[in-house]
Amino acid sequence: MNISQQRFTQALKGVLEYSKNVLHIEVIDTSDLDPYFKGDLDGKRIWIASALEDEEELFNVIHLLGHSIQWNLSKELRALGSVLHENPDDQLLRKLQEYEWEANCYGLKILHEIGIRDLDRWLFEKYRLDMFYLTHYYKTGEKLKAITDVSLAYQFTWPLVEKNIPEFIPYANPETRRGIVIDFTNLTAKGLS
């Protein structure tokens, strides 16, 4: 898949405008995140690591917008996504995987809403790899940028489908953090295909 950086920059600009003008969610570039993380959210705002390349920022912004939508529609999903779960049982892991999938389905809808349909495959590939990394992390606590036997044992790569975005009024969590989106970008990739 050969996509120019200019395309990611253009798409990111459109997503940021949609976030501000349609969803009324503020996206803030910041260097004030724990180094272990590259993004955070509170339901009304998204903080994104300012050092990210546009491609990585685009994925993380649309992913976090998806979670922001979830948080504003469901207190249960807000509670689920507000903590990093360590070694969840299989039932909770499945809920977490479905939560991640749904966020990316909202992200796909956002891309389509701004007229971008040529990044569907790219988004699916980013989501698929993210699911492998997250699944390994959830089950082991190990931050590893790899497709492992553990992540394959709990494989979850449903195809992304547009999910309509209901109207909502964004509201923020009362507590603050310094990161929730795990940064796998600076790790050596192993076993990726």
Predicted regions and their residues:
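Active-site recognition of the HExxH zinc-binding catalytic motif
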Residues: 59-75
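Basic/hydrophobic alpha-helical interface regions
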Residues: 5-25
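Subset of outer-membrane beta-barrel
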Residues: 27-31
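Short glycine/serine- and small hydrophobic-enriched flexible loop segments
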Residues: 108-112
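Post-HEXXH active-site segment of zinc metalloproteases
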Residues: 71-101, 105
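Pan-zinc metallopeptidase signature
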Residues: 86-88, 116-193
